[in-house]
Amino acid sequence: MHKLVLIRHGESTWNLENRFTGWVDVDLTDTGIAQARQGGRLLREAGFTFDLAYTSVLKRAIRTLWHVQDEMDLMWIPTRTEWRLNERHYGGLSGLNKAETAAQYGDQQVLVWRRSYDTPPPALEAGDERDAYGNPRYAGLPREQVPLTECLKDTVARVLPLWETSIAPDIKSGKRVVIAAHGNSIRALVKYLDNISDDDIVGLNIPNGTPLVYELDANLKPIRHYYLGDQEAIAASLAAVAGQGKAK
C-alpha cells in the first residue's frame, strides 16, 4: 500500500480579505503559518515521513511546505516546484472581494465561477498587470500555457500530465510523497483519484493547512482517505470555505 499526503496552503493574506487569488502571489498570514506548522506536527505525531515533496511556484504553497518540513525535520528532502500545481486562474475576478462580487452578480453566479467544473470567470485582457505571462516563474512557457482565466476543467487538464508523468511514477517507485498546493489544484487531483463526477465536484471544498491522507493500492486506486486533526474543527473550516462566495 502507498500513502500520499495532500495539503492546501495555510491561510493567505487574500484568504483573510476574502479575495479571489488564483495566480497572484500573495503570502501567508500568521494564522496561515500556524496552520501549516500544525499540519506538520500532525503528520509527525502520526508517524509520517517523506522522501519527496511537490509544490507550486506560488509562495503561499512553498512557504506552507517549508513549515511542514521544518516541523518534521525534513527540510533536506528533494522538492519539485511545478507551475502545474498552481491554483486555478481566476481571470478578471483576481483581487476582487468574493462577498462584494456575490452582491453584484448574485450568490449563484459566483458559486458557478468558484466551483463549477467547466465555466471559467471572465478572462483578463492580455497584458493586464495580473497577467503572469513573461513572469520569470513561467519562462519558456508559450502564451497558451499561461492562462488568462481557467475553470476547474482547465486546471485538471494541466495537473493530470504532472500526475501521470512524475507524481504517480514516483509513488509507484516507493517514494513517500507530500504535495503542498492549492484548493483547486488539490480538487483536481481528488476529482481524478476518487472519480468524482463533474456535477458532484461543485460540493467539494478543501480546508487550509489540513493534511489529507490517501491510502492507495498498487495501481494507485484509493483504498480510503481521511483528514488528520480535530474532525469538528475540520468541518467548521470546510463550512467557512463553502461560505466565502456568498453576499453578506
From Swiss-Prot:
InterPro entries: His_Pase_superF_clade-1, His_PPase_superfam, PG/BPGM_mutase_AS, Phosphogly_mut1. NCBIfam families: pgm_1 (TIGR01258), PRK14115.1 (NF010713). HAMAP family: PGAM_GpmA. It catalyses: (2R)-2-phosphoglycerate = (2R)-3-phosphoglycerate. Pathway: Carbohydrate degradation; glycolysis; pyruvate from D-glyceraldehyde 3-phosphate: step 3/5. It comes from Ralstonia nicotianae (strain ATCC BAA-1114 / GMI1000). It comes from the Bacteria. The gene is gpmA. The lineage of its organism: Bacteria, Pseudomonadati, Pseudomonadota, Betaproteobacteria, Burkholderiales. Homodimer. Catalyzes the interconversion of 2-phosphoglycerate and 3-phosphoglycerate. Keywords: Gluconeogenesis, Glycolysis, Isomerase. This is 2,3-bisphosphoglycerate-dependent phosphoglycerate mutase. Substrate binds at residues 8-15, 21-22, 60, 87-90, 98, 114-115, 183-184. The keyword Transmembrane does not apply.
